[in-house]
């Protein structure tokens, strides 16, 4: 500030609040300061004299506690004491000023403590981590501006609304620095017309290149930038100076800049301490400096200007719009996590998420890789993006997957709001599994027992042993593997080693000159629920749908996973062969112990039921899944009898399964994926046993224990060790071709609004 100017405060006793303007009596009369700018006698020629410095006052906190429309808030506005500029600290009147502010705070605290609703008023945050006046808390804020008339004083806000309010409040406080810089720039530009600048800042709405896409909402950044770039909010940074002679402006540029600096500091300090009225302050135009005579010692009081609530309404609109965008993005992320966790078809995940984002008018890009989804929310107004990574451990839960799909469809067809959908997804996440762990372990045993007759040529005598081995695998997977991260990485290998060792031990038991149990059937049936059939199937489907990254990664992992199982079978069988030289080396079951084909069809619904329970399917999903599974098995059985080629039989069987599932989804409004998946699991063990995938590991183990592994047979054994993985790939390719063909038949043009929730 100039050395030739002095700021003096004049304190006139004035009542701060009247009983008509507030709901509580004010026992203290506060002093409202007025400023007197004095100048020395050095510059007497062409002196502009003292100038009025306006101070924008914030409304009383009692006004925000009133119920009623926002548009009628003018009647509650009161004159709050203006906070002096920091440049006036040398005057020595700040102590008296602070005393008045403390008195007002004490009276407000007394009234707040008497009110049970407003006992702890929230504070308005700023970018410098400080807090200013009490924050306006609104309950049940909705996206419709007309429904915002009931402004309540409560601290319980939705998470997205609170986050949006904090963002708007912080950037409103940060706008003070933006205003100060614009004011200094306007003061330093000689002869610049401010009105022309305001016209240049306005965007031509008729320009098609200036407007973003109408089908998408703006992002978070574009809504926050409205606080800076909107013409209604930046007018306070434009200062209109009343000077007609440019030479006089240049002559007194130093003194004018000093006055402008004082004005900006007063305005900034007033907004900092009275932050709730920042929306009102931003809509006012700083008045022109009045030019008076050279009379020294004249006092000038602050003018009382009528407040406009358009800025406050604009801030409310930005806050609500920002909260709505954050809530929609939160729903999309939660939906993505739920679909991945509960086992949605991975090759259609990107399509599902794109459909959900399009309906919600959110611009989003999605990239799926196994176990991870990269989500990018774009902003068409600012050409920026907000990236999120959703990383989960994918499992299969058919029951909760159906619930997630119901929420997904309800939001797509406007039968459910986003807020209700988020609550529904949270409840699904928090809900316990439908079946307890010990029930899953028991049905692991039943699944191993029921798969033997129809896929691995097992007999009635083999069923109890298969049940014991299956329960052992279930205990390893559900009780031991989750407790140890190190063991979880070796679960497949150790499980196949233990079951293969015990299977050969039971198969070596002699009875009446022959073998009592079938070694190959027990070894294959024990690990049926940990076969990588679903992994290979998803990989082949992703490759067929041109998702090369996810399909290639998953297919390679499935092959390595298959080699792990084959290696475990070989090690387990070889260990028992090393201990017992009379161990069995048969890779097939005797014909005398095998069941008749007419009995095998009875085990298909039993095995399907075990799969449904293991995969947490609800009882309402059982009948359709069992019917589709039986139909697929019948088609596969007779096709294999006719063609003699197992890949062709798998393709035709999966085609029948896919057609039935998609028809059920189209007519019955069900989830085709949940109905089809157990039927696909029935196809995998049959094809694997028909092509001798598991028996290759048994052959390697037999060669090792009998010391027949030499240089001449090394190439044959190496091929056999890879046969398990290659057989799994062949089966998956046949099944994926049939499933894609079935989707093309039932949905020749796809689904227009939502993605196809099937294979």
UniProtKB/Swiss-Prot annotation:
Keywords tagged on the record: Endoplasmic reticulum, Membrane, Transmembrane, Transmembrane helix
Chief localization: endoplasmic reticulum
InterPro entries hit by this protein: ThrE-like_N (IPR010619), ThrE/Ser_Exporter (IPR051361), ThrE_2 (IPR024528)
One GO CC term on file: membrane
Membrane-topology annotation of the record: Multi-pass membrane protein
Pfam family, one: ThrE
UniProt-annotated stretches for the region Disordered: 1-31, 188-211
GO molecular function: amino acid transmembrane transporter activity
Composition bias type Low complexity, residue spans: 17-31
Subcellular location: Endoplasmic reticulum membrane
Membrane spanning stretches: 434-454, 456-476, 486-505, 517-537, 555-575, 597-617, 620-640, 643-663, 670-690, 726-746
Regions of compositional bias (Acidic residues) in chain numbering: 189-207
Family listed: Belongs to the ThrE exporter (TC 2.A.79) family.
Protein name according to UniProt: Uncharacterized protein C7D4.12c
């Amino acid at each position: 500030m100039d050395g030739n100017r002095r700021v003096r405060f004049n304190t006139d006793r004035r009542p701060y609040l009247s009983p008509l303007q507030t709901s509580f009596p004010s026992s203290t009369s506060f002093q409202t300061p007025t400023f007197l700018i004095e100048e020395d006698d050095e510059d007497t020629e062409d002196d502009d004299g003292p100038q009025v410095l306006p101070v924008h006052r914030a409304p009383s906190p009692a006004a925000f506690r009133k119920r009623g429309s926002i548009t009628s808030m003018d009647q509650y506005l009161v004159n709050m004491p203006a906070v002096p500029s920091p440049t006036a600290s040398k005057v020595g009147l700040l102590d008296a000023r602070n005393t008045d502010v403390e008195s007002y705070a004490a009276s407000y605290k007394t009234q707040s403590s008497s009110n049970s609703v407003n006992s702890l008023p929230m504070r308005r945050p700023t970018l410098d981590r400080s807090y200013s006046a009490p924050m306006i808390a609104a309950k049940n804020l909705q996206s419709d501006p007309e429904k915002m008339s009931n402004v309540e004083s409560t601290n319980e806000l939705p998470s997205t609304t609170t986050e949006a309010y904090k963002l708007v409040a912080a950037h409103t406080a940060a706008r003070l620095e933006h205003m100060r810089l614009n004011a200094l720039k306007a003061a330093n530009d000689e002869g610049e017309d401010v009105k022309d600048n305001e016209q240049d800042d306005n965007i031509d709405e008729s320009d098609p290149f200036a407007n973003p896409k109408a089908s998408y909402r703006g992002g978070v950044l574009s809504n926050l930038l409205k606080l800076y770039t909107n013409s209604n909010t930046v007018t306070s940074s434009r200062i209109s100076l009343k000077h007609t002679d440019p030479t006089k402006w240049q002559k007194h540029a130093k003194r004018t800049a000093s006055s402008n600096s004082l004005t900006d500091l007063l305005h900034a300090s007033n907004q900092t301490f009275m932050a709730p009225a920042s929306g009102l302050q931003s809509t006012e135009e700083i008045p022109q400096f009045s030019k008076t005579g050279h009379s020294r010692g004249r006092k000038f009081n602050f003018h009382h200007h009528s407040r406009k609530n358009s800025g406050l309404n604009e801030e409310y609109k930005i806050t609500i719009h920002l909260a709505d965008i954050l809530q929609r993005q939160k729903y999309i992320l939660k939906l993505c996590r739920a679909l991945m966790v509960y086992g949605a078809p991975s090759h259609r995940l990107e399509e599902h998420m794109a459909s959900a984002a399009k309906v919600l008018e959110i611009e989003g890009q999605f990239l799926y890789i196994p176990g991870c989804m990269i989500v990018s929310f774009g902003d068409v107004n600012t050409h920026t993006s907000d990236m999120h990574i959703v990383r989960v451990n994918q499992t299969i839960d058919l029951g909760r997957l159906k619930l997630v799909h119901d929420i997904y469809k309800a939001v797509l067809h406007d039968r459910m709001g986003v807020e209700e959908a988020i609550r529904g997804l949270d409840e699904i996440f928090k809900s316990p599994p439908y079946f307890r762990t010990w029930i899953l372990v028991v049905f692991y045993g039943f699944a191993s027992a029921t798969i033997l007759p129809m896929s691995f040529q097992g007999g009635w005598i083999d069923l109890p042993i298969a049940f014991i081995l299956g329960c052992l695998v279930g205990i390893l997977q559900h009780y031991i593997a989750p407790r140890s991260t190190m063991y979880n990485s070796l679960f497949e290998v150790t499980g196949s080693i233990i079951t293969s060792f015990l299977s050969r031990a039971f198969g070596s038991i002699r009875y009446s000159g022959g073998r009592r149990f079938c070694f190959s059937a027990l070894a294959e049936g024990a690990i049926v629920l940990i076969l990588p059939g679903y992994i290979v199937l998803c990989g082949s489907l992703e490759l067929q749908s041109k998702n090369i990254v996810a399909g290639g990664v998953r297919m390679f992992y499935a092959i390595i996973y298959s080699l792990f199982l084959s290696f475990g079978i070989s090690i387990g069988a070889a260990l028992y062969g090393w201990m017992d030289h009379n161990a069995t080396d048969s890779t097939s079951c005797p014909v005398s112990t095998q069941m008749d084909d007419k009995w095998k069809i009875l085990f298909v619904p039993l095995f399907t039921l075990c799969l449904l329970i293991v995969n947490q399917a609800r009882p309402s999903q059982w009948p359709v899944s069992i019917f589709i599974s039986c139909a697929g098995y019948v088609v596969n059985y007779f096709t294999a009898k006719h063609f003699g080629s197992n890949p062709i039989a798998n393709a035709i069987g999966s085609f029948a399964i896919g057609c039935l599932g998609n028809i059920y989804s189209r007519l019955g409004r069900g989830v085709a994926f949940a109905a089809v998946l157990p039927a696909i699991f029935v196809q995998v063990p049959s094809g694997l046993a028909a092509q001798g995938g598991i028996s290759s590991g048994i052959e390697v183990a037999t060669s090792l224990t009998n010391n027949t592994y030499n240089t001449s047979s090394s190439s044959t054994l190496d091929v056999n060790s890879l046969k398990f993985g290659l057989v799994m790939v062949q089966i998956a390719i046949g099944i994926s071709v049939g499933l894609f063909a079935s989707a093309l038949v039932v949905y020749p043009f796809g689904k227009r609004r939502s993605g196809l929730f099937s294979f």
